[in-house]
């Protein structure tokens, strides 16, 4: 999972998402509350590029609820957090 900050959201998300996808991992990403549109656009580009559904996933929600789900879900093996 990735949790990105409000400053430089696209650049910081790309640094986390691209390597994970390149080695065959799925990704769940949560943008900052202030800048969700930048990652929505990025994930639309991934879908347009042919990334299959369920491989790159975007979650928009309350910080605490999403963070708790990341930390508690057994399928999440790594978390990259900036901020």
Each language-model region and where it sits:
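Rossmann-like NAD(P) dinucleotide-binding subdomain of oxidoreductase/dehydrogenase enzymes
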Residues: 1-83
